[in-house]
Amino acid sequence: SMNVGICGFGKMGQIRADAIETHGFAQIKSVFDVNIPDNCKYPVANSIDEIIEDPDIDIVFLCLPNYFNKPKTIMALKAGKHVFCEKPPAFSAQDVRDIQEVERASGKVLMYGFNHRQHGAIDKMKSIVDSRKFGSILWMRSRYGKSVDGDYLNTWRAKKELAGGGILLDQGIHMLDLLLYLTGKPFDEVHAMVSNMYWKTPGIEDNVFAIMRNTQTGVTASVHSTMTQWRHLFSLEVFMERGYMVLNGLKTSSGTYGDEILTIAQNRTTAPAATWEDEERLTFHIDQSWAREIELFFDSVQNGAPVKFGSSDQALEVMSLIDMIYEHDLHQAPNLADQLNMTVKELT
């Protein structure tokens, strides 16, 4: 039987601990956090590195502030541990490539926490896309938002060098991952507007609007990722040649995103004239995502199953897309109109 060490024992570390206990494949040997909860029933280590260097620990869970993710993933792989790391994997695609070099050399399992792929409604949507029942995807439209309170400004999340970015890297990354998952193809053309009008925190965006296209397939998608959504929202629409799927709400621990309700056009629905009577509605009452992720991770550790969800290749895809979104925004010169006018004058 295997021993687990959990680095970071806040909300996510505790969610992972519960799922590990329920699964039963491994024991939790120790945990570390700067603020250990009073009711912690596990032995507490003195540091992250103590867990990573412990010869009795086989598996390390990294549930830490973002800036630890890359260096501690590399350190744990080099120490011969299997690693499960929360998102974001790092701050850039190049960071993920650096991690992959170490991963390949280590021969250990590395999996990233992209739990949204494991939600019941997403599972259903993916199976419908893959069945081609409604033909190919034409477009996808997505919105994901929450609000944060003033305390937010006092945490590591409000510092660019510690968080790496704002809402896109924190929450929007999940939606981008789902768009990539459902289409199965990367987006190579990106237009984006990134802003921090409300919290005005340097380098920490509170809103991102992005439109993306795969220039070969023509599949186009939009995402709005926001932390000024005063009433929390999750919405993902996928329209195909002969039907559609609309997911509103997401079953989460906070319960603030509403019921996870998936509306699907029935088989007999043909474009262009569908009405609400032609739909089936499915409500997903249980968030199975945490249990499912642990099950998949332990299957890879125990049986050598390839990492199918949350692999470093998928992490590289989503980080490449995030790089493109941030870069596109930077390349939009604020005085573009003046520059163009100057060019026109020079030409004439």
Go through each PLM region and give its residues.
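Beta-loop-alpha module in the N-terminal Rossmann-like domain of NAD(P)-dependent dehydrogenases
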Residues: 16, 42-102
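C-terminal helix-rich "cap/oligomerization" subdomain common to oxidoreductases
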Residues: 14, 26, 59-62, 216, ...
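Predominantly a Rossmann-like dinucleotide-binding segment in NAD(P)-dependent oxidoreductases
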Residues: 116-201
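Rossmann-fold dehydrogenase core element
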Residues: 98-115, 135-140
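Active-site loop of classical SDR/Rossmann-like NAD(P)-dependent oxidoreductases
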Residues: 281-295, 310
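N-terminal Rossmann-like dinucleotide-binding module
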Residues: 1-40
